[in-house]
Amino acid sequence: MKGQLFVICGPSGAGKTSIIKEVLKRLDNVVFSVSCTTRPKRPHEEDGKDYFFITEEEFLKRVERGEFLEWARVHGHLYGTLRSFVESHINEGKDVVLDIDVQGALSVKKKYSNTVFIYVAPPSYADLRERILKRGTEKEADVLVRLENAKWELMFMDEFDYIVVNENLEDAVEMVVSIVRSERAKVTRNQDKIERFKMEVKGWKKL
């Protein structure tokens, strides 16, 4: 059985990263797709674990070579998902989680219709604004860009399969875990098991 691609999206400050980290701890056979980006590395981030931090020149070369499943310029920086990473893990039967922006999600949706799309939303825009301002990791100009982009991204919630409102982290994590488990139980993902049962039943003689 092939793995499933899960796209988790939402505005900056909605809590996607925190949710994904917890989900990966609680579920087996799930891997996080590490994206490439041209933005500066934050103090707490690790190259190769949180992102692959590369120059814009290197990024554009990879675009020309067709190495990205999707890519977009977000908040003034380039972000891209490596096609080889995603496809190799799905073919191995592992579920892959992407943390990408709305532009990237819509791009993936056009190419991979069987992908599961989850939107992480804040309780309100006012709450989101407060979270971003409290973070204090970016310059004022960058914060303003993120707030404006958040307004735009929130308008696309109805393009997704599931909405998770992150009012409480534990509840939000459990909801995403439940979504993954539900998707794994779908008939379309278990045709091999169904066929085995049918073959077994056919092999039994009548009493």
Curated annotation (Swiss-Prot):
GO terms for molecular function: ATP binding; ATP hydrolysis activity; guanylate kinase activity. This is Guanylate kinase. Residues 3-181 form the Guanylate kinase-like domain. It is found in: Cytoplasm. The lineage of its organism: Bacteria, Thermotogati, Thermotogota, Thermotogae, Thermotogales. ATP binds at residues 10-17. It is an enzyme of class 2 (transferase). Its EC number is 2.7.4.8. NCBIfam families: guanyl_kin. Its main location: cytoplasm. It comes from Thermotoga maritima (strain ATCC 43589 / DSM 3109 / JCM 10099 / NBRC 100826 / MSB8). Belongs to the guanylate kinase family. It catalyses: GMP + ATP = GDP + ADP. Keywords: ATP-binding, Cytoplasm, Kinase, Nucleotide-binding, Transferase. One of its GO terms (cellular component) is cytosol. Essential for recycling GMP and indirectly, cGMP. SMART domains: AAA (SM00382), GuKc (SM00072). It comes from the Bacteria.
